Amino acid sequence: MPAHPATWALALVIISAAASSQGASQMRAAGEVCSILPDSAVAKDSLLRPPAPLVPTPEAVRGLYVNRWAALGRKMWLLIGVARTTEINSLVIDVKDDRGYLLYKSRVPLARAIGADTFMPMRTERMRAVLDTMRAHNIYPIARIVVVKDPLLAERKLDWAIKRVDKPDKPWLDKNGSPWLDPHQDGVWRYAADLACEAVGLGFSEVQLDYVRFPDESRLWREATFPLAAGRLRAQVIREQLLKTREWLRPLGVPFTIDVFGLTVADTTDMGIGQKWESFVDAADVVLPMMYPSHYAPGSYHIARPNAHPYDVIDKGLEDARHRSQGVPNAGKIVPWYQDFTLGKPRYGAAEIRAQIRGGYDNGIMSWILWNPRSVYTISALRARGALESGDTSATSPAPSVRRRREPSQPPPPAR
């Protein structure tokens, strides 16, 4: 990931209290970054404060995903403890989840208007303490912001939702009964950009956008209408929106990164979701394919049971990714997501996790992030902090044990 200055420049566009926040967002010119309410209208517990130095980007990012529930609870401090004692140097924290809710109280007008910051927001003092602690221990904070899968915004602002072809005044619903936003709508991406800008203002060192795609249901193309498509291919739409969003955020000087389906490294189509490797790999500073072996069909890479061969899947998949990136000028850095959860046989443990990591190392890809939807990780798979770097995991020093607390009362986020 590209390095960024120790201090950041935050461009603020102040709008009048009487102006419509949604209308103002639509009127902003490309290149303008944040839109916030005047100070007189901001809650007293606002998190924004004078700029502080951001944690610099590690040469090799080794991270864990922290879901919203984990961030709100005791698990946040446990995961910070993991990062202090192991090779983990980064935490990807849900700033906006796939229900549309924010982690903390926001100054972004649209977020306030739709109540995106009203569902159990993190207390101001706690959010500051989390980011200050991470900064003190040089732990790299990454803000994960879900873009197109936002049922809250789709319900509150129907104009931006995907519509049914038979009833254009009604939103299209996925198999779980949830509406999605239309990727053609610029406002969808401007909203994400505003949230990203705010997150950097709080102290996050990187912006990571997820669900930068169309829904992955084939019936969508029979049941939905896209009046703004204007003949463009889905992959072209996603590319154009990523490039615009990247430009809006460029003044912040932080890495612009995107999560993509793991199968994009091998599939030469857009898979119906608008994600084609050559179309997006140069539209971000970093691309993060979700390389979960359990998500590969039997026979992929001539492997009968991909889930049982994590090294081979990652090795072959990242070889494809590197090869395809070589043909694209200014291709983004590849940072794969690896699987730290069990879906089918075998049960995933330290050996399976290290096998994935070794598959990356053998391709010269030293960065990685582990995904577990509950943010419960296999600590025994991690090297102790300060252990010698090596692609050979046989000499790995075991990490100090960290007691994990199961929290069954907290609903896990759905698998991606």
Q: Can you say where each PLM-predicted feature lies in the sequence?
A:
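Substrate-binding cleft of secreted/luminal carbohydrate-active enzymes
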Residues: 284-297, 307-400
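Aromatic-lined carbohydrate-recognition surfaces of secreted/lumenal glycan-active proteins
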Residues: 65, 140-150, 208-209, 234-273, ...
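Conserved, mostly hydrophobic/aromatic
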Residues: 91, 134, 192, 199, ...
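Catalytic domains of carbohydrate-active enzymes, especially glycoside hydrolases
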Residues: 77-101, 201-206, 283-286, 360-367
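Glycine-rich, aromatic-flanked loop segments that form ligand/cofactor-binding clefts
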Residues: 88-95, 123-173, 206-209
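Aromatic-lined carbohydrate-binding/catalytic grooves of carbohydrate-active enzymes
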Residues: 86-122, 216-223
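Active-site-proximal loop/short-helix segments
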Residues: 107, 151-159, 202-233
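Active-site-adjacent "subsite" loops/lids of carbohydrate-active enzymes
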Residues: 52-67, 71, 132, 148-201
